[in-house]
């Protein structure tokens, strides 16, 4: 029998196919631009996004929305799978600057998950049980999480960390999306994550639900 995960994947594929069909019918108007940026943009790599933008008529490519999206896609390419990570240095709960580089270069860490989230983001908090399960299982085997919060309220940020038992590394500028890391990693929305290996290379992106546990399990078994 079909599992829930398989069913969900089938529905997601069907939805993406339908979205692409509607997108192809609306490349000459702003509805098509909205579909690409808000529906498909989150799933595509930087290069795939540039390829989609190139299919729009020249006059549509001059619109503010597509110009912004193209700039974002060009930045995304810098953090695609296979690219080196971009360093981040932000304050932890004690106000001490903690750099992503120091975590990645720590010999004890074979893989580091750079996780962008916020306490007000429902889907982010929905991922917490999966993050906890993976962290608890693999933290002593070389897996670490570097969480970057896009909260604007320090109390909300640290309260969520404590109440949900998120026992990994946390940093935040407490400025919402007005965060240098959001620009460097071309974050379109959250939750968003990047898996970095011990050499500092991005090896996976946006691992959700059980996919994170399965990926770490597979990598650490090698």
Language model segments and positions:
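Thiol/disulfide oxidoreductase modules built on the thioredoxin-like
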Residues: 166, 173-221
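Alpha/beta-hydrolase fold active-site loops
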Residues: 108-112, 191
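Oxidative protein folding and maturation machinery
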Residues: 1-103, 108-109
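Structural cue for short, hydrophobic secondary-structure segments
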Residues: 113-117, 147
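Extracytoplasmic/secreted envelope proteins and their assembly/folding machinery
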Residues: 50-53, 132, 154, 158, ...
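Conserved redox-active cysteine motifs that mediate thiol-disulfide chemistry
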Residues: 116-133
């Amino acid at each position: 029998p079909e599992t829930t995960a398989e069913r969900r994947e089938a529905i997601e594929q069907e939805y993406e196919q339908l979205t692409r069909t509607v997108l192809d019918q609306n490349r000459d108007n702003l509805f098509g631009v909205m579909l690409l940026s808000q529906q498909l943009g989150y799933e595509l790599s930087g290069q795939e996004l540039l390829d989609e933008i190139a299919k729009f008529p020249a006059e549509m490519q001059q619109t503010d929305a597509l110009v912004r999206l193209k700039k974002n896609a060009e930045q995304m390419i810098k953090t695609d799978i296979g690219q080196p990570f971009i360093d981040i240095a932000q304050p932890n709960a004690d106000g001490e600057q903690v750099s992503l580089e120091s975590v990645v270069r720590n010999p004890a860490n074979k893989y580091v998950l750079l996780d962008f989230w916020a306490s007000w983001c429902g889907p982010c908090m929905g991922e917490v049980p999966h993050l906890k399960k993976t962290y608890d299982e693999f933290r002593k085997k070389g897996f670490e999480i570097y969480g970057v919060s896009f909260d604007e309220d320090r109390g909300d940020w640290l309260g969520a960390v404590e109440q949900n038992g998120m026992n990994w590394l946390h940093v935040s500028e407490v400025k919402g999306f007005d965060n240098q890391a959001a620009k460097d990693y071309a974050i379109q929305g959250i939750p968003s994550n990047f898996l970095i290996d011990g050499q500092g290379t991005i090896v996976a992106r946006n691992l959700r639900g059980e996919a994170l546990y399965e990926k770490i399990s597979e990598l650490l078994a090698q």
